[in-house]
Amino acid sequence: MIKITKENIIPYLKEHLPDFDDSLPVNISMVGEGTEEEDGDGYVNYIYRVQTPKESLVLKQGTDISRVSQQEIATYRNRLEYNSMRIFYAITPEYVPYLKFQDRENNVFVMEDVSDLKVVRFQLNKNKMFPELGRQCGEFMAKTEFCTSEYYLSREKYRGLQKHFENTELRRIMEDQMFLDCFGCDVDYSLGNNFADFASQFSKDSRYRTELYKLRRKFMSHADGLIHADLHTSNILASRDEMKVIDMEFAFMGPFGYDLGYLVGNLISQYCAACFKRFPSEQNRKQFKAYLLATIKSLIETYMKTFTLCWERSVKERYRGQQGLLQSILQEVMVDMPGYASMVNWFRSVSDIPYPDFDVIENKDDKRNATVLSLMIDWGIMFGRYKYQSADDLIETIIGIEEEFRKSL
């Protein structure tokens, strides 16, 4: 296997892209060598940005050793990421980078560079707003999940996706890390012993553990449609009008509602941070918090609406007129989604893994308060989800817990 470097990347591209023009100045940079805010990727794979006056490309190579941690990792992930992007682009070309070519022998693919857009997580950390983010992400999830489900595809194509995207090794990371490791992870003591004791007490609660096991069972056994499976705000790039989703190597046939909950959880963490981090004024804080809640509402409602439209227009003949089945699917999403949101925030909040959403808060007491609020919301939505009928019910829980928490300060 050829290992791509800054020294050999130009002849490599010329070999695989005959129209690649290096007669003009070419700028080559490795993604991950810059700041997180600039790149948001490059921890596992070797990713290069190649810019000429005519075009800008990104080359991604998956080796058997992770770039940063130097741990062994399956190289097939590069092939699965390319194929998932190809499928998602066919369904929602407006939300996925355009692919140029794939080199399976060397675990490489090349796509358009979308770095003119910004990594959403770090823009939210700076209180930047993306008015269309909820709608765009809701459309992306609903369309791609429906169009890769058995409700749309032939049985043969659906089974083919299940087999192709088995993704055993990377799925194991999520199955263990997100659903199990929070019970044995090193609690973050940097926020004080009282916080560590509080977080540990929550983590040891058998009721919460039972809920995580129930969600893990669905994550492992429900092959509803092709999901991204790592759709956090660092894997979304956006401007005021555009949005692109990247980094799809965890993709597999998983449950409806997982990606939705994963992203909602990231937005909840931003909300908790916004309750305590610095703003130019309290009016700015109020506006940003309102924006985050509106984005959560738009995300969920757009998903439900778009999935329904896809169903009404394109569901297979045998399911036409079965509104009860559609409503059952959407209700299950409404119940599962807050659980997955709780799960992802819980793990990131109690562990000592850096969490940029909270790390941006400079004052230690404010950071601790934001993290505690997040844990309390995680607890509340995990057990409150069974009665939720709409996004408004979830948002009501978030606001209610914040109000009660402030009374204790």
Kindly label every feature range from the protein language model.
Residues Q323-L409:
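ATP/Mg2+ or Mg2+-diphosphate-binding catalytic cores
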Residues P53-S56, Q61-T168:
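Conserved ATP-binding subdomain of kinase catalytic cores across diverse folds
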Residues R121-F140, E150-H228:
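ATP-dependent phospho-/nucleotidyl transfer catalytic cores
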Residues G62-R67, D113-N127, F146, S269, ...:
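A glycine-centered beta->alpha junction motif in the catalytic cores
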Residues N83, Y258-V315, A341-D359:
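Active-site activation/catalytic loop segments of kinase-like enzymes and analogous catalytic loops
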Residues E36-T52, L57-L59, T210-Y258:
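Active-site acidic catalytic loop and adjacent metal/ATP-binding pocket
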Residues S66-Y76, C275-K289, I361-K367:
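Short, flexible/disordered intra-domain loops and linkers
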Residues M1-N107, R240, L394-L409:
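Conserved NTP-binding catalytic cores of kinases and kinase-like/nucleotidyltransferase enzymes
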